[in-house]
């Protein structure tokens, strides 16, 4: 098993991984069963992402998921994850109004879920908010590049940091670090720029569609393991085809129930 060598991963282990060049594995998780499996597999961090709005609740965007919904999901993950560090997204509308709102939302997540950190989107414009949360004793993971909560303002899911956008991305990265974040997600960023950001920062960078030069990688598990049978982003590599397997299994079950083959003597009392 590769990755961080620790019985219980904490933010200090993420800093150590950055310093010694150990790659950091991250997957999303939204329930106890997948959290237990990913934890046993040695995944270093589990992200209870607002992507649950899409892959769990079936909504078109992440914007409608609430803090209450995120907390329910995060509770399940933290119950099952014994080793992995659990991060919870602060959803849209729970931290942008004021720094006080952000702190209150983060405090609620930590108190009610048992998570180790929260994640918020934004760079320079969110630096003071990150600082306030960190000053409240709560670890923060930043998120820059393409930020899904701002997809309408950004014109949809498009690569960030090209051309003159590289300077903004670097400024965002340094602002997030200076604000006290322990790590930062780089989403849909040219590999060369993501590598440059990684080389300049002292905190860990976690890439998603950002090439191989970041300190770690994160994917939505339904994409990575083929549970989502629809169109996937270019940056996804499928490690399994669980959606097709589940479809065939469900068909087999329906057929056996219909034919009377299930339950049989073995499954009966």
Swiss-Prot record:
Q: What SUPFAM superfamilies does the database record attribute to this sequence?
A: Phosphoenolpyruvate/pyruvate domain
Reactions this protein catalyses: 3-methyl-2-oxobutanoate + (6R)-5,10-methylene-5,6,7,8-tetrahydrofolate + H2O = 2-dehydropantoate + (6S)-5,6,7,8-tetrahydrofolate
Residues that bind 3-methyl-2-oxobutanoate: 50-51, 89, 119
Binding-site list for Mg(2+): 50, 89, 121
Q: Which cofactor does it need?
A: Mg(2+)
Q: Which InterPro entries match?
A: Pantoate_hydroxy_MeTrfase, Pyrv/PenolPyrv_kinase-like_dom, Pyrv_kinase-like_dom_sf
Q: Name one Pfam family in it.
A: Pantoate_transf
Under Enzyme Commission nomenclature, its number is 2.1.2.11
The GO annotation for biological process reads: pantothenate biosynthetic process
A cellular-component GO term for this protein? cytoplasm
* Compartment list: Cytoplasm
Q: Where is the active site?
A: 187
Q: Does the keyword Magnesium apply?
A: yes
A GO term, aspect molecular function:
magnesium ion binding
Broad class of where this protein is predominantly found? cytoplasm
Domain of life the protein comes from? Bacteria
What are the record keywords, sorted? Answer: Cytoplasm, Magnesium, Metal-binding, Pantothenate biosynthesis, Transferase
Described function: Catalyzes the reversible reaction in which hydroxymethyl group from 5,10-methylenetetrahydrofolate is transferred onto alpha-ketoisovalerate to form ketopantoate.
- PANTHER family noted in UniProt: 3-METHYL-2-OXOBUTANOATE HYDROXYMETHYLTRANSFERASE
Please give the name of this protein.
Answer: 3-methyl-2-oxobutanoate hydroxymethyltransferase
Species of origin: Corynebacterium efficiens (strain DSM 44549 / YS-314 / AJ 12310 / JCM 11189 / NBRC 100395)
């Amino acid at each position: 098993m590769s990755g961080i060598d620790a019985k219980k991963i904490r933010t200090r282990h993420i800093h150590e991984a950055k310093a010694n060049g150990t790659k950091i594995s991250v997957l999303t998780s939204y329930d106890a069963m997948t959290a237990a499996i990913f934890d046993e597999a040695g995944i270093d961090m589990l992200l209870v992402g607002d992507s649950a709005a899409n892959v769990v609740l079936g909504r078109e965007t992440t914007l409608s998921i609430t803090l209450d919904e995120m907390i329910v999901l995060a509770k399940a993950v933290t119950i099952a994850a014994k080793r992995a560090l659990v991060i919870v997204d602060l959803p849209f509308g729970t931290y942008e109004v004021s720094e006080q709102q952000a702190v209150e939302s983060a405090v609620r997540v930590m108190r009610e879920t048992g998570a180790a950190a929260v994640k918020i989107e934004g760079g320079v414009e969110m630096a003071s908010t990150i600082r306030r949360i960190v000053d409240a004793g709560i670890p923060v993971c930043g998120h820059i590049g393409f930020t899904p909560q701002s997809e309408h303002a950004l014109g949809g899911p498009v690569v960030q940091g090209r051309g003159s956008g590289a300077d903004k991305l670097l400024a965002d990265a340094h602002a997030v670090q200076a604000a006290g974040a322990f790590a930062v997600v780089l989403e849909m960023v040219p590999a060369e720029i993501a590598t440059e950001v990684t080389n300049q920062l002292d905190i860990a960078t976690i890439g998603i569609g950002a090439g191989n030069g970041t300190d770690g990688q994160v994917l939505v598990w339904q994409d990575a393991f083929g549970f989502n049978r629809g169109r996937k982003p270019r940056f996804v590599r499928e490690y399994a085809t669980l959606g097709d397997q589940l479809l065939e299994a469900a068909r087999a079950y329906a057929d056996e129930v219909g034919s009377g083959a299930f339950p049989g003597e073995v499954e009966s009392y």
